[in-house]
From Swiss-Prot:
Binding site for Mg(2+): E253
Compartment annotation: Cytoplasm
Similarity comment: family membership: Belongs to the class-II aminoacyl-tRNA synthetase family. Phe-tRNA synthetase alpha subunit type 1 subfamily.
PROSITE patterns: AA_TRNA_LIGASE_II
Keywords: Aminoacyl-tRNA synthetase, ATP-binding, Cytoplasm, Ligase, Magnesium, Metal-binding, Nucleotide-binding, Protein biosynthesis
A matching Pfam family: tRNA-synt_2d
Matching HAMAP family: Phe_tRNA_synth_alpha1
Enzyme class: ligase
Lineage: Bacteria, Pseudomonadati, Thermodesulfobacteriota, Desulfuromonadia, Desulfuromonadales
Transmembrane segments: none
Name recorded for this polypeptide: Phenylalanine--tRNA ligase alpha subunit
Reactions this protein catalyses: tRNA(Phe) + L-phenylalanine + ATP = L-phenylalanyl-tRNA(Phe) + AMP + diphosphate + H(+)
Gene this protein is translated from: pheS
Organism of origin: Pelobacter propionicus (strain DSM 2379 / NBRC 103807 / OttBd1)
E.C. number: 6.1.1.20
Coiled coil: none
Amino acid sequence: MREQLEQLRCEAFQAIADASTGEALQNIRIKYLGRKGAMTALMKGLGALSAEERPVVGQMVNSIRDEIESGIEAGLFAARERARDEKLRSERIDVTLPGRRPGCGSKHPITLVIEEVCDIFAGLGFSVAEGPEIEHDWYNFEALNFPPEHPARDMQDTFFVDNNLLLRTHTSPVQIRTMLKRKPPLRIIAPGTVYRCDSDATHSPMFHQIEGLMVDQGVSFGDLKGILTIFTNQLFGQKTGVRLRPSFFPFTEPSAEVDIACVICGGKGCRVCKNSGWLEILGAGMVDPEVYRHVGYDAEAVSGFAFGMGIERIAMLKYGISDMRLLFENDVRFLRQF
């Protein structure tokens, strides 16, 4: 029986050595150590041994059982280690590879236009000035030659906060505030947000303007046209035609509407320009002497011009945008184009 036990031991350890998976090792445990296994079958023969041999063989059976159990446990541990190593190899991450970069946004078309306009005028000697969006009636209207009952106030529907405070309807109040703080000569542009009760495909209740002001000795209407011609040529192209049409603004005299040759048809006439060949882009004029009086300037000693443009309109013309509301809907499919 001792020979049978030793042979069983050798067979079991050979099977353990050949097993490569945990499942195979569990089958070996069942085959040799299970209730119907080989060791159990041999132990049934202990009763046939003499009283002297029985304890010796019994001790040998227990020793071999423990050895096989230890061998199986060692094999299971090794199998788990191999499985773990294989998983690590298959899921290995190369830490030297670059990571996934988050999607980068881009500047809004309104921001792009404001920056470009400011850069152009900076090259012409203009500095940027700012003012509050909640403005006093005096700065927004009266100082700009809009007296309380002036009919020109009907040109703009205004959001009033109370009797004297309002959401500014243009950035022209920045010109008043700047002239009250500084003496000529001065050249400023004032980009900012303005508010009016108007909303359709070409108007928004909140939009952006850039006002410009130049005051010095001997400034003429010709200087105004020259500055605006340089500006439009740099913004829309060197061959962009410019024309000025008589108009009216309470704070400038004389006043003009500034048109450029249609950027779509090149001045030949199309649906965008209503077959006129021209597109209106801004209003301008020589500063009215009454405005100088409000800020304490001597209208006999200095002269100057002012102009104002809607940034949304400039963006629509520059980028071929048909509906102003697209600029405020935050549609990523639209904004990704810029």
